[in-house]
Amino acid sequence: MKKTLLAVAIGGAMFATSAAAVDFHGYARSGIGWTSGGGEQTALKVNGGGSKYRLGNETETYAEFKLGQELFKDGNKSIYLDSNIAYSIDQQVDWEATDPAFREINVQFKNFAEDLLPGATLWAGKRFYQRHDVHMNDFYYWDISGPGAGVENIDLGFGKLSLAVTRNTEGGGTATYGQDKVYYIDNNGQIQYRYEDRKADVYNDVFDIRLAELNVNPNGKLEIGFDYGNAHTKNGYHLEPGASKNGYMITLEHTQGEFFGGFNKFVAQYATDSMTSWNTGHSQGGSVNNNGDMLRLIDHGVVQFSPKVEMMYALIYEKTDLDNNQGKTWYSAGIRPMYKWNKTMSTLLEVGYDRIKEQSSGKKNDLAKVTLAQQWQAGDSIWARPAIRVFGTYGHWNDKFNITDRTNAGYKAKDAEFVAGVQFEAWW
């Protein structure tokens, strides 16, 4: 309740300042679905994977509400306050209460040093920082978002430089030389005690350097990034033996504009040790299970075959090779063609395939899904939103490892499911 009142108070204060000047942006989706096996809509995702092809395959109500306002303006200089509160619920009943997530609250000072760094922006606070993603499967492959600070868009003449630092904290990842007596009940119902090391959080800082808008060919631009993650603790505490402590990630992304009426992005990334847990740019230096490296290649984009037909596509290869032999390789491919009947009605087909290969055994888990959707949207672009869609989704999987993850959920290791439903999606 306190968090809800805080959100209302922030929104009210911003509107009270100057209602006409407040920017309101956001994202939302919700709907209803049924599963052939009975019950509510089931999400179809490969066993061991972190992403799924999303058309006709999202089972939650999710929303982000962004309020922002320019608080200062003097010539080319301006100060902007931005905020973002997000909600996620299971879309099961009428009244579903949840605590909001305070995803963003930051201030951006544009042209803060106009004479020295024209066009550059100084910022501080919690922020979605220059995120890069594959829309089809909601996969954010370069995302260091969190509390932080930085200077971005420093014009070097041949490109733009951005510098930032953000933080993500691991709970209970360190120990101290002190111990606490912990009581527990044994298998015979007797009260026993043992001594356990005191735990404290691990603080992971990520230092981010990006050089963007490098013109390398006609309508083609290159972005280069280096992220270094480093863990530190409070005085008197230490990382667990074998903890990765630090690591780095290198990213190269080439964006080709005017590509068959759309665009193409090719991405190559390499990460080590603490940067391999999430494989996105966040660091987990307190972990003892992420020593190793990761290589990822992505090709994704949108093409327009005719005024009536557009298509999204994605190809992903990601290999995480860990010293403890617990890594995996992820293969993914998907397409989403769209046929436009008119400016506000279209038909979409999404075909997606994911495979996870276990490092230790070489065994593989596979999942393929196909979705057919009839859609009504605000415009004739594949990016047009809001949209309301009626969909049917068929998924088939075949698991060879971690089978209990599937069977404990009431499914067979090799099985299939059909899902149908209605969903809206909007961004503004």
Swiss-Prot record:
Membrane topology field: Multi-pass membrane protein
Residues under site feature: Important in sugar transport: 140
Molecular function GO labels: maltodextrin transmembrane transporter activity; maltose transporting porin activity
GO BP term, example: monoatomic ion transport
Domain of life: Bacteria
Keyword Membrane tagged: yes
NCBIfam families attached to this UniProt entry: PRK09360.1
Family, per entry: Belongs to the porin LamB (TC 1.B.3) family.
Known role: Involved in the transport of maltose and maltodextrins.
Annotated protein name in UniProt: Maltoporin
Taxonomic source organism: Mannheimia succiniciproducens (strain KCTC 0769BP / MBEL55E)
Gene: lamB
